[in-house]
């Protein structure tokens, strides 16, 4: 087994372990009482924002090893921080549906930004595939949270009006 294969497998394991609580929190929204689901929706959004802050730290740390792309990586490192901050502010000051909707649209759309896409495509193919899989999983989880907030039967968003 080559060194790159071991490195990729450990990286993949770390990534899947780190998003597992987010998946479990999101899935538990539909199997819990309304009062508990209200708290779980907020906790899952906070956990997602923490994941974005960790992602920013990882990108920030990559700057040291990639001298040529330091300025691009510096700008890219601020993107997850900005996304998490704006999502949190809009959830707090407007309502959680706006915050989660913003997170969903930006996470889905960020992959189509040319600077970020060029940096991702410089990675080896297994890493690009892993990033695509994780992006899809995170978008599905964010859609589940958004549908919880917009559920017309329990109407949890009415607390904010």
What residue ranges belong to the model's regions?
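The first (N-terminal) embedded transmembrane alpha-helix
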Residues: 9-30, 136-142
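Cytoplasmic-side transmembrane-helix entry/capping segments in multi-pass membrane proteins
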Residues: 12-15, 68-79, 100-103, 126-136
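Alpha-helical transmembrane segments and their membrane-interface exit regions
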Residues: 50-51, 103-116
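Helix-adjacent hinge/juxtasegments
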Residues: 59-90
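Transmembrane helix-loop-helix
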Residues: 90-108
């Amino acid at each position: 087994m080559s060194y790159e294969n071991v490195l990729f497998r450990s990286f993949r394991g770390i990534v899947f372990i780190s998003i597992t609580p987010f998946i479990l929190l999101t899935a538990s929204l539909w199997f819990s009482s309304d009062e508990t689901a209200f708290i779980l929706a907020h906790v899952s959004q906070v956990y997602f924002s923490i994941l974005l802050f960790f992602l920013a730290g990882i990108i920030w740390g990559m700057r040291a090893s990639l001298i040529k792309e330091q300025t691009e990586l510096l700008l890219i490192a601020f993107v997850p921080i900005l996304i998490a901050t704006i999502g949190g502010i809009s959830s707090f000051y407007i309502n959680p549906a706006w915050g989660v909707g913003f997170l969903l649209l930006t996470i889905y759309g960020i992959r189509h930004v040319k600077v970020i896409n060029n940096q991702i495509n410089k990675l080896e193919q297994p890493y690009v595939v892993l990033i695509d899989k994780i992006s899809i999983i995170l978008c599905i989880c964010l859609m589940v949270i958004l549908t919880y907030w917009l559920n017309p039967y329990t109407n949890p968003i009415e607390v904010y009006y």
